[in-house]
């Protein structure tokens, strides 16, 4: 992406929900590099897919020559953003928040270049300026610039005030002031002139623009990326097991890869624009190729490879592909012990069994059949495989050779029903 028409390029990819004073921002970007920031509050010990679009937007700006600031909210994470939340957030302890700050800082770092000259990325923590601030300073220097009338009319706050079952505490009500002051501080300390964030952050961003103008007489800008939705109306970034996390210990690279492989045809080309750095020409050519091939589309695999490689690196991508191909072919010889651990983590149903369990009992415990009698029938009809090999003996007893790495056995009933045994 080039700096001269960066906003237009982002719009062509569907990455702009709202922007303040678009013409003035476009003109400012055309004049030369700026500093911009995006904030990430430590409300959990990992970022999730919802954070990926704004994080990648920071990267897009850096690739165009601008300087990104990744702000982790060590202070705001102690409060919790009420924007469009149905109820009060749970307040976490300071130790917990500090631990999460470090984890999120570590997650953000690989996406940005912190050693590339004048536009090297900066990592910041808003606890640095809020940690030593007393309440009188907060009220005198920040609070006096805010009208309560305007604050309660912000859509994110109005929704909470209008709920019969939940109002809003002064703690969360004050969050808007904290995020606004972040913008003013970063403007003063690093010359930050643009804040980007999710579309739910619009009210907080515009407050920061107003406060920066009042405190420093600087014109600054805001840009939000859209809330990602799926064509069928269901939430993006969720599975039956909950959120899809960027931390491989919470969502394994295999499950992460499978999430993208299962993208609907109606969504995949749009998601390629959101989540990859492929050019629009490349994406359009891929769509045309898929349309005319008469085969299953390639786009899902291109998307899965791009995003998994970006988030989990070459080794994580290789493991995800290796597991996928092994399960598809039934040949498990290329799988490593770590690959089986990914399956046990979240890749498929897993059951722990004592080593004296026979095949019939294993099928019942794995919930692949309802009874030992049904297990006998399934085994006898050649519908059961152990580690990819069919087993037709109803009286079969497992041997050490079935326990891969001394610990794992993969059962399959039919073509699609799997369970991983973890032997005790």
UniProtKB/Swiss-Prot annotation:
GO cellular component, one term: cytosol
Single GO BP term: tyrosyl-tRNA aminoacylation
Keywords: Aminoacyl-tRNA synthetase, ATP-binding, Cytoplasm, Ligase, Nucleotide-binding, Protein biosynthesis, RNA-binding
Signal peptide positions on this chain: none
A Pfam family annotated for this UniProt entry: SYY_C-terminal
Catalytic activity field: tRNA(Tyr) + L-tyrosine + ATP = L-tyrosyl-tRNA(Tyr) + AMP + diphosphate + H(+)
Membrane as UniProt keyword: no
Motif ('KMSKS' region): 235-239
EC number: 6.1.1.1
Gene Ontology MF: a single term: RNA binding
CDD domains associated with the record: S4, TyrRS_core
UniProt-annotated location(s): Cytoplasm
Annotated S4 RNA-binding domain residues: 357-414
Residues that, per the record, bind ATP: 238
Binding site for L-tyrosine: 37, 175, 179
Top-level enzyme category: ligase
Domain of life the protein comes from: Bacteria
Motif 'HIGH' region mapped to chain: 42-51
Chief location bin: cytoplasm
Entry-linked InterPro entries: aa-tRNA-synth_I_CS, aa-tRNA-synth_Ic, Rossmann-like_a/b/a_fold, S4_RNA-bd, S4_RNA-bd_sf, SYY-like_C, Tyr-tRNA-ligase, Tyr-tRNA-ligase_bac-type
Role noted for this protein: Catalyzes the attachment of tyrosine to tRNA(Tyr) in a two-step reaction: tyrosine is first activated by ATP to form Tyr-AMP and then transferred to the acceptor end of tRNA(Tyr).
PANTHER family linked: TYROSINE--TRNA LIGASE, MITOCHONDRIAL, TYROSYL-TRNA SYNTHETASE
Family: Belongs to the class-I aminoacyl-tRNA synthetase family. TyrS type 1 subfamily.
Database matches in NCBIfam families: tyrS
Subunit structure: Homodimer.
Name of the protein: Tyrosine--tRNA ligase
């Amino acid at each position: 992406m080039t700096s001269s028409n960066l906003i237009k390029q982002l719009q062509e990819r569907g990455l702009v929900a709202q922007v303040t004073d678009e013409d003035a921002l476009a003109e400012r970007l055309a004049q030369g590099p700026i500093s911009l920031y995006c904030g990430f509050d430590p409300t959990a010990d990992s970022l999730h897919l919802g954070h990926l679009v704004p994080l990648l937007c920071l990267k897009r700006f850096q690739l165009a020559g601008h300087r990104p600031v990744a702000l982790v909210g060590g202070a705001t994470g102690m409060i919790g953003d009420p924007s469009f939340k149905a109820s009060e957030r749970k307040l976490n302890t300071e130790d917990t928040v500090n631990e999460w700050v470090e984890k999120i800082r570590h997650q953000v770092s690989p996406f940005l270049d912190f050693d590339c000259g004048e536009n090297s990325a900066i990592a910041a923590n808003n606890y640095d300026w809020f940690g030593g601030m007393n309440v009188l300073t907060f009220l005198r220097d920040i609070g006096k610039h805010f009208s309560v009338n305007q604050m309660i009319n912000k859509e994110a706050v109005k929704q909470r005030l209008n709920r019969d079952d939940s109002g809003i505490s002064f703690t969360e009500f004050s969050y808007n002031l904290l995020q606004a002051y972040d913008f003013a501080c970063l403007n003063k300390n690093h010359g930050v002139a643009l804040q980007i964030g999710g579309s739910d952050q619009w009210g907080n961003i515009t407050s920061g623009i107003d406060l920066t103008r009042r405190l420093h007489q600087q014109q600054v800008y805001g840009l939000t990326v859209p809330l990602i939705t799926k064509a069928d109306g269901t939430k993006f970034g969720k599975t039956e097991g909950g959120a899809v996390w960027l931390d491989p210990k919470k969502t394994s690279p295999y499950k992460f890869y499978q999430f993208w492989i299962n993208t609907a045809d109606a969504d995949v080309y749009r998601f390629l624009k959101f989540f990859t750095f492929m050019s629009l020409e490349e994406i359009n050519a891929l769509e045309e190729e898929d349309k005319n091939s008469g085969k299953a589309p390639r786009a899902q695999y291109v998307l899965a490879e791009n995003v998994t490689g970006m988030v989990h690196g070459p080794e994580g991508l290789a493991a995800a592909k290796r597991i996928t191909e092994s399960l598809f072919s039934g040949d498990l010889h290329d799988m490593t012990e770590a690959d089986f651990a990914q399956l046990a983590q979240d890749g498929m149903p897993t059951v722990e069994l004592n080593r004296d369990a026979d095949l019939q009992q294993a099928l019942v415990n794995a919930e692949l059949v309802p009874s030992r009698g049904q297990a006998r029938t399934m085994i006898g009809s050649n519908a059961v495989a152990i580690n990819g090999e069919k087993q037709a003996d109803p009286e079969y007893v497992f041997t050490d050779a079935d326990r891969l790495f001394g610990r794992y056995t993969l059962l399959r009933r039919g073509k699609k029903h799997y369970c991983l045994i973890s032997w005790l």
